From Swiss-Prot:
Its EC number is 2.3.2.23. Residues 1-10, 21-45 have a biased composition (Basic and acidic residues). This is Ubiquitin-conjugating enzyme E2 E2. The modification Phosphoserine is found at S11, S15, S18, S19. Accepts ubiquitin from the E1 complex and catalyzes its covalent attachment to other proteins. In vitro catalyzes 'Lys-11'- and 'Lys-48'-, as well as 'Lys-63'-linked polyubiquitination. Catalyzes the ISGylation of influenza A virus NS1 protein. Belongs to the ubiquitin-conjugating enzyme family. The active site is at C139 (glycyl thioester intermediate). Gene3D superfamilies: Ubiquitin Conjugating Enzyme. InterPro entries: UBQ-conjugat_E2_core, UBQ-conjugating_AS, UBQ-conjugating_enzyme/RWD. It catalyses: S-ubiquitinyl-[E1 ubiquitin-activating enzyme]-L-cysteine + [E2 ubiquitin-conjugating enzyme]-L-cysteine = [E1 ubiquitin-activating enzyme]-L-cysteine + S-ubiquitinyl-[E2 ubiquitin-conjugating enzyme]-L-cysteine. Autoubiquitinated. The modification N-acetylserine is found at S2.
Amino acid sequence: MSTEAQRVDDSPSTSGGSSDGDQRESVQQEPDREQVQPKKKEGKISSKTAAKLSTSAKRIQKELAEITLDPPPNCSAGPKGDNIYEWRSTILGPPGSVYEGGVFFLDITFSPDYPFKPPKVTFRTRIYHCNINSQGVICLDILKDNWSPALTISKVLLSICSLLTDCNPADPLVGSIATQYMTNRAEHDRMARQWTKRYAT
């Protein structure tokens, strides 16, 4: 009888121990759940980002209205879709230049820091030019160190058109084309017209 009584007595204590253990485990897990949550700081960061986006978006919307009403000669530009920060531009080869008759497409990407940082502008159409490389990168001072918040995308497009009329071999991205421009202008112009006909018409 005493043995059975012991078994009966032992049984609740064992189950009670496991119940306490489960409670202890659940209590210990509570802080872990709380530790997973702290991401509310991101609200402050995102609010600053939202303020930047609001400032830049207003400026871009203003420029879009201006360039739609009064586009630069031989140029057009506007958002690709719903994203105000991603534009596509079209430049017609300037009359009298080796790019005349060509239609050149460019991508324009604005950052949330615009207009305090320049837009990124790249050619999508291949072009034979000493200041524009095969990736479409443009060597233009106002897109780098000489950028100013007073500049607009219309002025940038005008500067690119000027670069198509008069390249700058003293500051080339493609050294071989710059050398050819200075030493064999006739061959340079022939190649530029050939590329324009092949890739931009």
